[in-house]
C-alpha cells in the first residue's frame, strides 16, 4: 500500500514550545467541550432545544479536532511524518464529513434562534425533541454526502509526483497538487460543491438573522432586545470564524493564497475553532456560567464534607 509523508508547517520538526502550545489547545478544546456537554446534560435549566444543539456542536468539535491533532502530535513525539494511504483516506473522509456536518448544523441552529425570537409562543411545538433530532440527522447526512462524494474521487487520482504533502493533514487542495494528471475538471466540480455546501447554510443563516434583526428592532423592551442580541451574537461570531476560514481555503482562487497561508488558515479552523466555540458560547451566557458555578460549588462542598 502506498505511503504518503507530510510536513507539519515546515520541513523541519516543530519546536518543543510549539508542540506544547498545540497540545495545550487540544486538551483545552476537549476538556471545555466535554464540560459543556456534561453541564447541558445534568442541569435541567439547560434542557432546551438551543442547548441540545450546542451539545451536538460540541460533540462535532471533539470529533473534528481529534481527527487531525492526535496524529500530528504523535508524529512529533515519534519523529516520523508518514501516513498510510488508508489512513490518509480515512482522515480525509472524516474531515470532510465533520466539517460539512458543522456547516449544516450552524445553519440550522439559526432557525432555532429565529423561532425563539420571532415566534416564541410556537417555540415548544416548532422546536420539539423530534425536530431537534431531525436537525442533527440532517446535519450528519449533509456532511456524510460531502465525504462520500469527494473522498473516493480525490483518492483515485494517481499520485506519481512527490509523495510529500505540503500540509499537516490530508486536505483536498494539498493532495491534488501531488497528482500527475489533470485535475482541473474535478477542481471545478469541487469548487461548485463547496460553494453549495457553504451557500445553502449561509443563506439560511442570512435569512434567519434578517428576520431576527427586524423583530429585535421592533421590540419595545430594552431588556428583551439586549437578551436577543446577546443570544445571537455568539452564534454569529462562531459562524464568521468557521465560514470565513473555509471560504478562504475552498472558495478563494488558489492564485490568491500560498501553501503557507493555507496551512495557517487550516490550523485556525481545525485546531483553534473547536477550542474557541465553547468559550464564545459560554463566557457570555449566564445560564452556562451559572450551571458551572453550581457544579463547582457542589464539588467544593462535597470535598469539605469528606475532609471533615
Curated annotation (Swiss-Prot):
Signal peptide annotation: none
Matching InterPro entries: GPCR_Rhodpsn, GPCR_Rhodpsn_7TM, Olfact_rcpt
Record localization: Cell membrane
Pfam families: 7tm_4 (PF13853)
One Gene Ontology term from the biological process aspect of the record: detection of chemical stimulus involved in sensory perception of smell
UniProtKB keywords: Cell membrane, Disulfide bond, G-protein coupled receptor, Membrane, Olfaction, Receptor, Sensory transduction, Transducer, Transmembrane, Transmembrane helix
Ranges facing Cytoplasmic side: 41-51, 110-130, 210-235, 284-308
GO molecular function, one term: G protein-coupled receptor activity
Recorded superkingdom: Eukaryota
Bilayer topology annotation: Multi-pass membrane protein
Annotated disulfide bonds: 88-170
TM regions (residue ranges): 18-40, 52-74, 89-109, 131-151, 189-209, 236-256, 263-283
Extracellular-side segments: 1-17, 75-88, 152-188, 257-262
GO cellular component: plasma membrane
Family: Belongs to the G-protein coupled receptor 1 family.
Function noted in UniProt: Odorant receptor.
Protein name per UniProt: Olfactory receptor 2T7
Organism from which the protein derives: Homo sapiens (Human)
Amino acid at each position: 500500500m502506498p505511503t504518503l509523508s507530510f510536513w507539519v508547517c515546515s520541513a523541519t520538526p516543530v519546536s518543543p514550545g510549539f508542540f506544547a502550545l498545540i497540545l495545550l489547545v487540544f486538551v483545552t478544546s476537549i476538556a471545555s467541550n466535554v464540560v459543556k456537554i456534561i453541564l447541558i446534560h445534568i442541569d435541567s435549566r439547560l434542557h432546551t432545544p438551543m442547548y441540545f444543539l450546542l451539545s451536538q456542536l460540541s460533540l462535532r468539535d471533539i470529533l473534528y479536532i481529534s481527527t487531525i491533532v492526535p496524529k500530528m502530535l504523535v508524529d512529533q513525539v515519534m519523529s516520523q511524518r508518514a501516513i498510510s494511504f488508508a489512513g490518509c483516506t480515512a482522515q480525509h473522509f472524516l474531515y470532510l464529513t465533520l466539517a460539512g456536518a458543522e456547516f449544516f448544523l450552524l445553519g440550522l441552529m439559526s432557525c432555532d434562534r429565529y423561532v425563539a425570537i420571532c415566534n416564541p409562543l410556537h417555540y415548544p411545538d416548532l422546536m420539539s425533541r423530534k425536530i431537534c433530532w431531525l436537525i442533527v440527522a440532517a446535519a450528519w447526512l449533509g456532511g456524510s454526502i460531502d465525504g462520500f462524494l469527494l473522498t473516493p474521487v480525490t483518492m483515485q487520482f494517481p499520485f506519481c509526483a512527490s509523495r510529500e504533502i505540503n500540509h499537516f493533514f490530508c486536505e483536498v487542495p494539498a493532495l491534488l497538487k501531488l497528482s500527475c494528471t489533470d485535475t482541473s475538471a474535478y477542481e471545478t466540480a469541487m469548487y461548485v460543491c463547496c460553494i453549495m455546501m457553504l451557500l445553502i447554510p449561509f443563506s439560511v443563516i442570512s435569512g434567519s438573522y434578517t428576520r431576527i434583526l427586524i423583530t429585535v428592532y421592533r421590540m419595545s423592551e430594552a431588556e428583551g432586545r439586549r437578551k436577543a442580541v446577546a443570544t445571537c451574537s455568539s452564534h454569529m461570531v462562531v459562524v464568521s470564524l468557521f465560514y470565513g476560514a473555509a471560504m478562504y481555503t475552498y472558495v478563494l482562487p488558489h492564485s490568491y493564497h500560498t501553501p503557507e497561508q493555507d496551512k495557517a488558515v487550516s490550523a485556525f479552523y481545525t485546531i483553534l475553532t473547536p477550542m474557541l466555540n465553547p468559550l464564545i458560547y459560554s463566557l457570555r451566557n449566564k445560564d452556562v456560567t451559572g450551571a458551572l458555578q453550581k457544579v463547582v460549588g457542589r464539588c467544593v462542598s462535597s470535598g469539605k464534607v469528606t475532609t471533615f
